[in-house]
Amino acid sequence: MMVLAGDWTDLKCNVSGYPKPTITWLRAGTPIDMNNPKYVVLPSGSLRIYGLTPADSGIYSCEASNPLGKARRPVELSVQGKNTVNDLIALK
């Protein structure tokens, strides 16, 4: 998935199961700090990331688990810098 720097995006995580699975979001295999206001897990389980920068690029994974097991789905996020008029002038 490719997005522009400065934007926000939702990484989808559609899960179902019984008992209801718990969702954990990871980046590069490490749980994301949900105390950081940059990240919000929506009621659907999707991860919303605000204020994207190229440093946010990487592999994110949605992990769903319950007492019967767990499953993980990775998604690659690529954040591209925005071209500005100043950038274009500098390239001449």
Regions found by a protein language model. Give the residues of each.
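Short strand-edge motifs at loop-to-beta-strand transitions and within beta-strands
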Residues: 9, 45-48
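Conserved Ig-like domain signature around the intradomain disulfide
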Residues: 9-11, 21, 56-64, 73
